[in-house]
């Protein structure tokens, strides 16, 4: 049996925590589908490495175009960094790096190196100034193509960037996607 659910917020719905339905749609808590966790890395205004734990993104492409599509709130400093610098990296940590990846939330400060402070290693990128994370087996370097609000009046913006370079560890270079996912331990 399927339940038919209206998409408007029910009047009797209690928030998970204060403001949770202002930051997220209430449907995010009902229609939970697993997404790959990534660390979106940028440079702060002072040049320090920034790392944003992220799960609202996808990769899509056609022919010679491969695009990173992210959803970000306009008041996050990662969003401001992307608009200012016009670039970022999407780094995919394995399960082994999840503790450090989640630590980026706790070491999120205006001027510090969030990557190093979370126990990860900054790695230079090849085509962009945004740093990569050495421990991640897959990193995609991206340049901003466009950004726009999700809907009128939303603080959530869609950000699209062309992937201009890919760094991939030997352990995940195989062509079989199932083997790659297993090796990456996503």
Predicted regions, residues:
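Basic, polyanion-binding surface patches
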Residues: 1-186
